[in-house]
Amino acid sequence: MKDFNLFLLYGNSILPECILILSLIVTIIIDLISDEKNTPWLYLVSLTALVTSVVILLFQWKEEPVSTFFETFQINSFNNIFRLFILICSLLCIPLSIDYIQCTKTALTEFLLFILTATLGGMFLCCANDLVTIFVALECLGLSSYLLSGYTKKDVRSNEATMKYLLMGGASSSILVYGFSLLYGLSGGEIQLQRIVNGLLTTQMYNSTGMFISMIFLLVGVGFKLSLVPFHQWTPDVYEGSPTPVVAFFSVTSKVAALALATRLFNILFPSSSTEWHLLLEILAISSMILGNFIAVTQISMKRMLAYSSISQIGYIIIGVIAAESNNGYASMITYMLIYIFMNLGTFACITLFGLRTGTDNIRDYAGLSTKDPLLTLSLVLCLLSLGGIPPLSGFFGKLYLFWCGWKAGLYFLVPIALSTSVISMYYYLKIIKLLFTKQNRQLTIYIQNYKVSSYALIPKSSIEITMIICVVASTLPGILINPIIAIAQNTFF
């Protein structure tokens, strides 16, 4: 009874996560008692739980920062906004997956369980305040992502992607845990983040070699989750081999959660070593922007191209992490991350829809698509232009604000490189856009010739199209309504 009262006292702060846990239990029960394999009730339960969690989180928005469950979780505006981002990702990815699951005739229950579990792990990771909870939440997110990548068991490419993802993910987690063990030992046996800092000061180990080594290990572990160069090797293969809706999910969810973790870990644990980890992050960001954009130019697979594009995009976002000491550093990172979620998911919704109708992922096979499906063409064009940063779309204003904050923070070497590589990215985005409106060798490809779409092509009829339109609108309107978004982001603190 005492434990139950304690849960009621502290549980309010993690009520959104509790709703997701309840939905997981209900989903399993419905699957056990239902004779129908893919009952619509499963979608209803999952989407209702996610919407309820979003509403609860919005009601908790202005509450005072609090540490709950013996300082295991820390709830504040910074953590809440990243928890909200993860819920938005899941809320968009489930409708995006409905038609895919129906067409491929794969099991729905497992898919929803993995999505909800990964969402739960990501949300806990955003507010975890000790090393053990961080690792458990990270593995909850990671293991669910591994299982999702191998969701289509009979697909050889999916199995290969899962194996690569699992092996490299396990290696990065091992490195991260070793970094945690060094912090635990150097601080005199502390696991809570702020107590680790106090312990390091007490043991006079704060500027020791062991502390620097632990920082390197943490950077490697987090770099894998963020797909930063040179820890990106898994990304193209996993993106290409995994089911497209699954790629859409962990291309944003894992990055949101890992970004929240990296920002909190480095700013809380290494405040006096900021020069060192800022320099290391700058090197990784520059490598990611240059390598990601140059290799993306050579790709012929749409998913591999988006994989390298995502590597370069996270390089841009790192500018906001490094510039966090300025007044607008966090705000620029948060603003661009929100815009990136919609741009990226909108693009993946487009290629999911095209893949279901044609069965191909080759960029050349998109030639002449505008003659058959103007809605899909327009949506893909707007999302790609927004990713490239073309005004007046939201991607332009997000990048402009991000680069301006970086310049204001004194990143005079990093920002010009970001601007230059952003121009390079426009080449492969515009190359695809040109292809959509032209015919290959003056004739349509066999895939476009056999492309079937109803006469009411401009009216959305499927859940993928509805998700696609929501993402396209959200990738466009914030360019006009950017000031309120920035104002909300500027009120976000640890």
Swiss-Prot record:
Assigned keywords, A-Z: Chloroplast, Membrane, NAD, NADP, Plastid, Plastoquinone, Quinone, Thylakoid, Translocase, Transmembrane, Transmembrane helix, Transport
Keyword NAD: yes
An example Gene Ontology molecular-function term: NADH dehydrogenase (ubiquinone) activity
GO CC annotation, single: chloroplast thylakoid membrane
Chain ranges passing through the membrane: 13-33, 39-59, 81-101, 107-127, 131-151, 166-186, 211-231, 243-263, 277-297, 305-325, 336-356, 378-398, 411-433, 468-488
Membrane topology: Multi-pass membrane protein
GO biological process, one term: ATP synthesis coupled electron transport
Location of this chain's protein in the cell: Plastid, Chloroplast thylakoid membrane
Enzyme Commission number(s): 7.1.1.-
Stretches of the chain forming a coiled coil according to its record: none
Task performed by this protein: NDH shuttles electrons from NAD(P)H:plastoquinone, via FMN and iron-sulfur (Fe-S) centers, to quinones in the photosynthetic chain and possibly in a chloroplast respiratory chain. The immediate electron acceptor for the enzyme in this species is believed to be plastoquinone. Couples the redox reaction to proton translocation, and thus conserves the redox energy in a proton gradient.
Family indicated by similarity: Belongs to the complex I subunit 2 family.
Subunit and partners: NDH is composed of at least 16 different subunits, 5 of which are encoded in the nucleus.
The name this protein goes by in its record: NAD(P)H-quinone oxidoreductase subunit 2 A, chloroplastic
Organism: Angiopteris evecta
